[in-house]
Amino acid sequence: MSTDMETAVVGKVDPEAPQPTHIDVHIHQESALAKLLLAGCSLLRIPASASTQSQGSSRVLVASWVVQTVLGALSVVLGGTLYIGHYLAMYSEGAPFWTGIVAMLAGAVAFLHKKRGGTCWALMRTLLVLASFCTAVAAIVIGSRELNFYWYFLGDDVCQRDSSYGWSTMPRTTPVPEEADRIALCIYYTSMLKTLLMSLQAMLLGIWVLLLLASLTPVCVYIWKRFFTKAETEEKKLLGAAVI
């Protein structure tokens, strides 16, 4: 039964003529308008990297403002410590105080300008950045000049003096053992005090150097952004010329 059906089907198919085969060849060539649109789409992807770079530079600026504020506070605190001791000539110029105050003001005004904007805040921010740079340079010069300077009562003979401020009319005699021990202990503590004061001055110098670098950060970020934008513009021009 199935064999007869297959024979019948074959009999029906065989008389039919073979269908012609059509091969359609389409040659597609992009127009100049399509190329321009593709180039525009590719160029629109570049600002994504630019926005990423802008966010990175903004974070660097915020970090520099925080560093300025913290270092300014540390400068004031260390300056107050040295002023309490009043053993150094550095406190007479007040370098730790005006340097720290200007740095803290520069950081605070930068944050306010970022939050509120405005020409007045921008002008104040620029002036305080310049002032922070100048005060940091002046403080470094003063601190390096007076790094090893001590007042008269911290000299080498501070432990040999009498308790009175007048000239002693008694001739010098060989100190007794108790007096010799006292002098030795006094010299030991005086040397420790000198080491402490030198360390505080070195810390202040380090803080002022960091403040100098922090005040230069906005300028460095601005120059870097200018070069980055210039490189992006040249890349866009080259890409557009290559597409056209």
UniProtKB/Swiss-Prot annotation:
Protein's cellular compartments: Membrane
Modified residues (Phosphoserine): S42
Induction data: Up-regulated in kidney upon proteinuria.
A single GO cellular-component term on record: membrane
GO biological process: negative regulation of dendritic cell differentiation
Tissue expression notes: Specifically expressed in lung, kidney and spleen.
Membrane association type: Multi-pass membrane protein
Predominant subcellular localization, coarse grouping: membrane
Keywords for this protein: Membrane, Phosphoprotein, Transmembrane, Transmembrane helix
InterPro entries: CD20-like, TMEM176A/TMEM176B
Residue spans crossing the bilayer: 60-80, 92-112, 122-142, 204-224
Family: Belongs to the TMEM176 family.
Self-association and partners: Interacts with MCOLN2.
Protein name in UniProt: Transmembrane protein 176A
